[in-house]
Curated annotation (Swiss-Prot):
Keywords: Coiled coil, Membrane, Signal-anchor, Transmembrane, Transmembrane helix. It is a single-pass type II membrane protein. Residues 34-385 are lumenal. Residues 356-367 have a biased composition (Acidic residues). Residues 44-193 form a coiled coil. Residues 169-385 are annotated as: Disordered. This is Protein GOLM2. It is found in: Membrane.
Amino acid sequence: MVGFGAPRRTGRLPPFVLVALLAVIGLLAFNYWSVSARQAALHDELLGLQAQVQRTEVARSRLEKRNSELMMQSDSHRRQIEQKQGEYQGLGERLQARDIQAQRCELDKSKLQNNVSLQMADISHLKEQLAELRHEFLRQEDQLHEYKNNNTFLQKSLQEESQQCAQQLAERKREYEENLTKQKEELDKQPQKDEEEGGTVDNKMHILPSEVKEKIEDPSSNRLPFAQDGIKLESDAGMPEIEDNEPAKEDSLQNDVKGQDTGALPSQSKSLLEKQPSLQPLSFTEHEVKKPLPDKKETVQIPEVEENALQLEPHPLKQMPRDSKTMSFNLKQSRFFDENESPVDPQHGSKVADYNGDDGNVEDDDHDGQADAGEYHKDHLNETL
């Protein structure tokens, strides 16, 4: 094939015919393409319409079913309405019955209000009675406090009376000591009288040991004046038995003999006795007296007397039932109660202490402190003696 610029050969179609044919072919191709595209669109539309028809058929069947259901529901609603109307009539009848019952309740309410007013009056009366009972309770409580105060006052008065008794006993003991010193002075003056009389001295020296022995053996002569009635201080107070005052007299006789052994004059012995501290009564409380004393017995003998002192033969004395500490404590303990007064009942004291509560414990602590002080005074007094 030759190009357009080449010389044209003879026997062939001209080029413009070829161009026209090509244009026709293109036009036909374009028409075919547009027709095919329109056919496809129409086919699609047909398919869509068919689907829409199917959907409308389905919707129609659904609507028919829905219509049948609605008809059934309308029938059921109609029946329900008829039933509700019957229930409404029943509720109306019940409402009338409730109205009648409400009227009855109003009547009952009025009756209850009347009863409440009566009960309120009763409550006010009971409150008045309660106030009276409270006043009575307060009055009895005041009486109880007054009774407690009276108990404490009685306890204090008993303590004061016991102290007064102890002071009286101390005064009697002082009188006893004065009488004892007078007897010692008379005993010191007796040898001088015997020497003046002459031949009667030997007879009196033989009689004197027997008299001393009888005095030591006879417990009634060694007792205090207020203890000679045979009254035992042991009573329901729980106090230990107060021994006789024989050890005190033996101790004083022993001190006298010791003073004569050392060659002391009667005036010097009297001055020594005056220099000794006086036995002050200690305030023993019931708590201290209740403690039993240890029962100790020691053998104490009077030493032999020299020949130049009264010219007495050595004479052994009887055994002392207690030592010096126990003896001094027995003397103080014997001073605690008078022979005409009974000791304080320990049960009464314990009841008062239990009744007062913590006050009894505080008094026990005070009694313990007084007991320690009393023991210290006793030890110091025994050392000085």
